[in-house]
Amino acid sequence: MKRVLTALAATLPFAANAADAISGAVERQPTNWQAIIMFLIFVVFTLGITYWASKRVRSRNDYYTAGGNITGFQNGLAIAGDYMSAASFLGISALVFTSGYDGLIYSLGFLVGWPIILFLIAERLRNLGRYTFADVASYRLKQGPIRILSACGSLVVVALYLIAQMVGAGKLIELLFGLNYHIAVVLVGVLMMMYVLFGGMLATTWVQIIKAVLLLFGASFMAFMVMKHVGFSFNNLFSEAMAVHPKGVDIMKPGGLVKDPISALSLGLGLMFGTAGLPHILMRFFTVSDAREARKSVFYATGFMGYFYILTFIIGFGAIMLVGANPEYKDAAGHLIGGNNMAAVHLANAVGGNLFLGFISAVAFATILAVVAGLTLAGASAVSHDLYANVFKKGATEREELRVSKITVLILGVIAIILGVLFENQNIAFMVGLAFAIAASCNFPIILLSMYWSKLTTRGAMMGGWLGLITAVVLMILGPTIWVQILGHEKAIFPYEYPALFSITVAFLGIWFFSATDNSAEGARERELFRAQFIRSQTGFGVEQGRAH
């Protein structure tokens, strides 16, 4: 159990951000009928929304972006719903439960990428793009190579996330509902395909909004009940937690989870720039009507997420007090029933009884569905819009493109289910770290420099992007997580767990060097086109709005 918790602590920063990979062995719980009934209510309601959305999806624009008619407030809630995962809720509260103050550092660390998105990316992305971030990256560069690179970066990130999500979903549902792992994986896969296949972005958006509201309500109620228990005094909360925790006052000391400054910096950069390169997050900015609404989306999303991560800190300390000190929630060996990831779930039972426990369990499942739906749509659009319609079959009709997108949804769903079953007993937490590293090292540098650096050329973007992607993958394989823990070697060739510091540096240097040394006529033409792109990115002139978006 100690080794499982150590692995969780090491991999949680990435896992908690967007994947629901619950690492290590799980203990199957008795069938929770309250949770199953509440979850069925959620499923019926969201399938009703999907049916409603399917009647309104008439074009490619409706399918990919909900017609561009989502408001900034709605999109902010949907982004929060896409970003706040079950592992954010269960994982960070478990981290606070075991390590105290360090959990707050990690939970707030997930917000550091959002100012970059707010100030540098959101408005220009919305003004330049239509459906995917590849629209922006290829605006003045060579369409074919850039779209292939962007689509590959997106698909690798989506695939890694989906596997982690499916395995995490199976284990989590086994924990919370007492359902069989394979049934859980198939259920998530089928529902995910139904949401995206029939409802497109409109259904996905409303599933994410509903999930965000339910999660924020549930976490708020738990935090309120914890604070009520201590007379709404943080001093009492921390004092009581220190009094019952095995580590005592040490739970208030920071710095126990990252081994050295290089690891801390690499982790921070990966979180910060990886967030700004996630395809399913970037895609959400095309669902609003203009750049102003895109900016408002980030403002609202950051507020909702900041509030949520503060709540997880209170929930974690509440669990120390009300769960950790209560033998009712321990097994014969003195360990928490179901493992430390169940700390928040046990707290739900402690503060709200069996009915609220069922509600929180259902919300955790709803959370997974909202995240995988967004991932699937991002992956499908990369194939149908970036590869099929703009590379392999230029001039394809909307109907053909939508057909390819829906076929891709089915293929992604089936692959996700199969891999979820195959990876049942594997350590998949590294996949989330790798996905973040690739988003930070391949997607983010190309998006940023295509919008801000006038001297960028196709050659530089291609060389730097591929170098960043390959470096992230190779260093992750040679690092301690895969080389030692999974492959069983005695010592890692690359000593750090997080490769982002090195792979991001390689990507930016590669883009700069190969662009600066590009003296071709094509490169000169691409540099000249920057001024027109800059004007469009600032003014939005030429951007179709509303349903014509």
Curated annotation (Swiss-Prot):
Coiled coil: none
Residue ranges annotated as Cytoplasmic topological domain: 56-75, 126-145, 206-211, 284-302, 382-401, 451-461, 517-549
Cell compartments where the protein resides: Cell inner membrane
Keyword vocabulary terms for this entry: Cell inner membrane, Cell membrane, Ion transport, Membrane, Sodium, Sodium transport, Symport, Transmembrane, Transmembrane helix, Transport
Gene3D superfamilies named among the record's database cross-references: Sodium/glucose cotransporter
Cellular component terms (Gene Ontology): plasma membrane
Highest taxon listed in the record's lineage: Bacteria
A Pfam family per the record: SSF
GO MF, one annotated term: glycolate transmembrane transporter activity
Main location (coarse class): membrane
Protein family according to the UniProt entry: Belongs to the sodium:solute symporter (SSF) (TC 2.A.21) family.
HAMAP family, per the entry: Acet_symport_ActP
Protein name, per record: Cation/acetate symporter ActP
Species assigned in the record: Escherichia coli O157:H7
